[in-house]
Every structure is written in C-alpha cells, then in structure tokens.
Amino acid sequence: MIFDTPLQGGQLIRRYKRFLADITLDSGERITAHCPNTGSMMGCAEPGSRVWVSRSDNPRRKYAYTWELVEVAAGVVVGVHTGRANALVEEALLAGRLPALRGYRRVRREVRVVNRPMRADLLLGDHSEGEPDCLLEVKNVTAAVADGVALFPDAVSARGTRHLDVLAAEARAGRRTALVFCVQRPDVREVHPADAIDRAYGQALRAALADGMEAYALQGGPSPEGIELTRELPVHCP
C-alpha cells in the first residue's frame, strides 16, 4: 500500500478524547488530527514522539489531518491507523503471502454473517482447488512488550470477544473461519493474547481455536511512503 499523498512529519503534543491528537508539524504549524484508533495505544502515544499524518482535501471533513504513523523507538515506526488493516491484509492475501490461505481468487468485504450479529471483515471465495469459503476477521496490532512479543488487544474489547464467539460458532457448524492479526510494527516476532488487559478476549480466542477457527499474523514495516505486510508471524496462545 502506497500512500496517496506524501505524509507530513511532526511531533505529538497529546492524544485526547480517544479520537483526537494535537501535533506540531515540521513546518511549525500546530494542528488537531483525527486519531483512527479506538484502543489505548499502549506505548504509541507518548507526548514528544515523532509522528506522521496524512491530509485530506475533502471539505466535509471536520479534521483534515489523520494520524498514520508513530516512531516508538529509534527506527521503529508503527502504523496506528486501524482502518487500513483490512486493505493491507487483503492485499497480502491476494499476493499469496499467507500460505494457509493461498488459492482464493475472490474477496468480498464487510459480509454479513447469516443469523449472526456480525459482519465479517472479509469473505474469501472461489478457491483454485475447491477449498471452502473462509470468513475472516482482521485485527490491527500495535502494542508490544519485551522480548519481541506483540499483544492484542491493548484495551478491553467486548466487541472483539463477541466476534470470536461468532467465528467459533461458525467453525462448529462446519464453516472455515480465520482471524488474521495485522502487525504494523517491525520489531516483534510473535503475537500473544493480552490476558493481563482483557482476559475474556484471551479465553474466547483459545476457545475459538479449539472449535476449529484458524489464527494467523502478518507483519509489515510501515514507512512514510507506505505499508506492506510481507512476513508471517506465529500466534502463540499458551
């Protein structure tokens, strides 16, 4: 994924009200940007951090700028725009970068799951070797701790837990279902459920896996030019 227009750099002043961030651009202009991330942004919203924003020319938008990236350590850039995760994963799947899900030639977005309170992020279909369609949920991962471990979620996610329950039920009914973590940071080597943050989510993830849901992780190294998921990481649920 290449950004439509070059990102502008700056320094984070503060994130507040969940969806807003005050930033001083490199030009010296102070702006308020939309923060497209509903989580706690653990370790990714420290005042003074180097950040990058995109700018929209849409006159209907209240905030022209959107926070896209943050540098959390020297040379470690993290993508915080959760709204880009679905497109990044779709791009990677169509390029064959996740071996377990290769062969699907059709992707539908935001597909309602019949008789379930959920829309699947992606529905993979028309497999070249006749494999069943796959309901797929995408989650953006930005949080990490020591030893290269990425964590999800970074805040309690009742909605995420409900979606896992639906995927588990669909798996028990014989459908193929999968969860793909979109890891937008280059400094981690595996993904764990964040039990200390949301124990219910971790329990639901383990239960869904036991019921036949599949779980994968794709990693990319964001830059001000673009983001591409190129590497599969293990999902570890001890």
Curated annotation (Swiss-Prot):
GO terms for molecular function: DNA binding. Gene3D superfamilies: 2.40.50.580, 3.40.1350.60. It comes from the Bacteria. Pfam families: SfsA, SfsA_N. CDD domains: SfsA-like_bacterial. NCBIfam families: sfsA (TIGR00230). Belongs to the SfsA family. HAMAP family: SfsA. This is Sugar fermentation stimulation protein homolog. It comes from Alkalilimnicola ehrlichii (strain ATCC BAA-1101 / DSM 17681 / MLHE-1).
